[in-house]
Amino acid sequence: MDDQSQPGHPQPDSVAAIASLNDPIRRSLFDLVSHSATAVGRDEAAATLGVPRGTVAFHLERLAQCGLLETEFQRRTGRTGPGAGRPAKLYRRAAHSITVSVPDRHYDLAGDLLSSAIEESDRTGEPVRQALTRVSVERGRSLGASAGSLDAVLTFTGYEPLDDGDGGLLLRNCPFHALAVSHTDTVCQANLALLNGAADGADEREREVCFAPRDGYCCVRIARRAG
């Protein structure tokens, strides 16, 4: 998983991206581009759909702004140099996936942690559970250092932190809920290690990460340090 796909990095608004397809012209354009073997230009799209070129250009740009399409420039005449004309702006479906879940889930992050742990175990002979803890701590440190605070990591990663009234936080949502239900020990271990790493990376001094399972909440809570 590259850095731009990690929680804590700005991402296109997934809800807005999906909602943008509610417009019938925009949906038709997205389908046209998605099913094309090559990048599609504005003239081609307008001719195929029988829609004015200006309208097509507007909707293609909106789809690109939402992160559903990527753009490139090409000279389709095959000519180069002076007199070859301006390159045409072309569109193709974005390579990354856009998903929407309510509450927020990050199964991509869980899958990356588990895959990395297995690869490390195969490479070094380290037991998989130990590798998972280490990999999760390292990823958490990276997220904490990048976000600048533990609270930012919790928010971006979908934990839905709530003030517990005692200087700490309850985490209303588990970003790995379905996996945690099926593989509780493994996923909760990785979750705890991830947030311990995030606290360390963000240089969190006033609070600590605790394993405290509670119905309706994440298995981890953030507690005020004693003393």
Model-derived features: positions:
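Short, charged/polar, Gly/Pro-enriched secondary-structure boundary elements
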Residues: 96-101, 176-180, 226-227
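Conserved segment of winged-helix/HTH DNA-binding domains
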Residues: 81-120
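A short catalytic or substrate-binding loop motif that flags glycine-/basic-rich loops and adjacent residues
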Residues: 83-84, 153, 214
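Basic, Lys/Arg-rich alpha-helical nucleic-acid-recognition elements, primarily the DNA-binding modules
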Residues: 1-94
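Short beta-strand micro-motifs in enzyme catalytic cores
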Residues: 87-91, 167, 216-220
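Short terminal or interdomain "cap/linker" segment that borders an active site or interface and mediates
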Residues: 205-227
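Generic recognition of long tandem-repeat/solenoid scaffolds
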Residues: 100, 168-173, 220-222
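Mid-protein regulatory/catalytic core that forms ligand/cofactor-binding pockets
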Residues: 107-112, 116-210
